[in-house]
Amino acid sequence: MSYADNVFINMCKDILENGTSTEGEKVRPHWEDGTPAYTIKKFGVVNRYDLSKEFPILTLRRTALKSATDEILWIWQQKSNNIHDLHSHIWDEWADENGSIGKAYGYQLGVKHQYKEGMMDQVDRVIYDLKNNPFSRRIMTNIYVHQDLHEMNLYPCAYSMTFNVTQKKGEDKLTLNAVLNQRSNDALAANNWNVVQYAVLMHMLAQVCDMQVGEMVHVIADAHIYDRHVPIIKELITREPKEAPKFWLNPDIHDFYRFTRNDVKVEGYEFGPQIENIPIAI
């Protein structure tokens, strides 16, 4: 059984069995027909993945690796806030007539800040510290910038990464670990999507910094299942998980800004039937 499937199944069961409902409360999200999008939610969900043992992609249904990678590179590498730079239409609902989502996501990672070592944006600061001061406890990014929230077409869901490097006994290479903080996570539409893309990011950064990957800890303040997703989730978690596939990252690339969506793949990826036309709350 894929470990990622096991984590997902247990999380969804916990939400369904022990979560609380927002039905009847004042909620922002709504369905396309204007109906309020209520959820069953759990506070403070923490999921751990050891990337050195397994790539955390679901086999219950397919997670689109290249599209997920394209999105994380759009944010972290291109530092873009324009959906025209993407190969998918996931963000279309939040873009203006020019394709911009405002001062959100990639925009924030591209803002340069003054450090003692010079002007750098947050991504370059992370790479600099991982290479030059790997045991620092200050290696992190944060894109939830309050002064710019009014100019964001949507607030960041996954908003912070904290990196931590360890030296395992008997290992020559350092190990890169990270905590992904997320204020809100849609279990069906976004959970494994986010897990996969940040796992890819960690693999890329580890390779660039001559490290090996370790643990990724996913901290979710509000993990939820939307009311119209409940029957879909109930069916999904009854499926038989398959073995986890092997992750491949182009070993010839050692510059983070040279990676493309074509430099990643999963080998031996078997998965259950895809779920079509998932309703998305906006």
Give the location of each predicted region.
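Terminal, non-catalytic protein-protein interaction segments that mediate quaternary/complex assembly
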Residues: 1-282
